[in-house]
Regions:
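Active-site rim/loop-helix segments in enzyme catalytic domains that contact anionic ligands
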Residues: 1-88, 116-123
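Metal-dependent de-N-acetylase/amidase catalytic core
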Residues: 66-218
Length: 218
C-alpha cells in the first residue's frame, strides 16, 4: 500500500531460511536453500514495490541456540539491527510482537531484539515502532495458518489500522507466490485465505509506547 503510493519501503530479513526444508521443493538444508530463500525475498520485495531487501544472514532457527557466551547470537543481531536502522533512518519500523504471529521462535526473538534496540535508545531519534497483530474476534474462528495456531492481541491495544484494497491484495498474493521453496500453491492459498480472514481489509498494529509515563506503581 505505502510502496505503491511512493513511500520508501525496505524489508529487513534477519534469518537465512537454510533450515526450512519443504519436501515438495527437493532442496536440502544448507547454503543452497539459503541462496534460494534470498532470491525469493528479492522477488517478493519487487512484487510489493519495496526496495531490495536487507538480508542480515543469521542462521535459520539459530537465534534460540544456547551458547556458552551469554547473549549470543542475539547480541550480534541487536548490533546489526541497530546499525541497519541508523543507516536507513526509517520513520516507522514494523515487526512481530511478543507472540510472533503464530508462535515461530525466530519471529518472537526478532521482535524482542528490535524492541531491545528501541528501549536501549539505539534506534534513530523519531523512529516509531509498531507490532502487527491479530484481533481476538478474528482469531477465534480463523482458519489454520500453515496448520498452526495464531495468537491474538487485545483489541484495545491495536490502535493503528492500515486499510488495503484489491490492488494491494493482488500484490501481496504475488509476493507470497515468490516463496515457492517454502510452500505449495495449495498451502499458499490456504495461508493467504487465513490472513484475509484475520485482517478483513485492514491490518491492525500496536504501537510501542516506550518511555516513562509514571513515577510510582501506585
Amino acid at each position: 500500500h505505502y510502496a505503491r503510493n511512493g513511500t520508501r519501503v525496505v524489508v529487513v530479513v534477519a534469518t537465512d531460511g537454510r533450515m526450512g526444508v519443504s519436501e515438495h521443493a527437493h532442496i536440502p538444508a544448507g547454503d543452497s536453500l539459503a541462496k534460494v530463500r534470498a532470491d525469493e525475498a528479492r522477488c517478493s520485495a519487487r512484487q510489493l514495490g519495496a526496495q531490495p531487501p536487507v538480508l542480515l544472514g543469521f542462521e535459520d532457527a539459530g537465534l534460540a541456540v544456547l551458547s556458552p557466551w551469554p547473549g549470543e547470537p542475539l547480541d550480534r543481531l541487536s548490533t546489526r539491527v541497530a546499525a541497519t536502522l541508523n543507516e536507513l533512518h526509517p520513520d516507522v519500523v514494523l515487526t512481530w510482537g511478543a507472540e510472533g504471529g503464530y508462535g515461530h521462535q525466530d519471529h518472537r526473538l526478532v521482535g524482542d531484539v528490535v524492541t531491545q534496540v528501541f528501549q536501549s535508545g539505539a534506534a534513530p531519534a523519531g523512529t516509531r515502532l509498531f507490532y502487527v497483530g491479530f484481533p481476538p474476534e478474528r482469531t477465534a474462528n480463523a482458519p489454520r495458518w500453515y496448520g498452526m495456531k495464531v495468537y491474538p492481541t487485545a483489541t484495545e491495544y491495536l490502535t493503528t489500522h492500515i486499510a488495503y484494497d484489491q490492488t494491494d491484495r493482488d500484490a501481496a498474493r504475488r509476493a507470497l507466490g515468490c516463496h515457492r521453496s517454502q510452500a505449495t500453491d495449495a498451502e499458499m492459498n490456504e495461508s493467504f485465505s487465513a490472513l484475509e480472514h484475520l485482517w478483513a481489509g485492514e491490518v491492525p498494529f500496536q504501537q510501542w509506547r516506550g518511555g516513562p509515563t509514571a513515577s510510582k506503581f501506585f
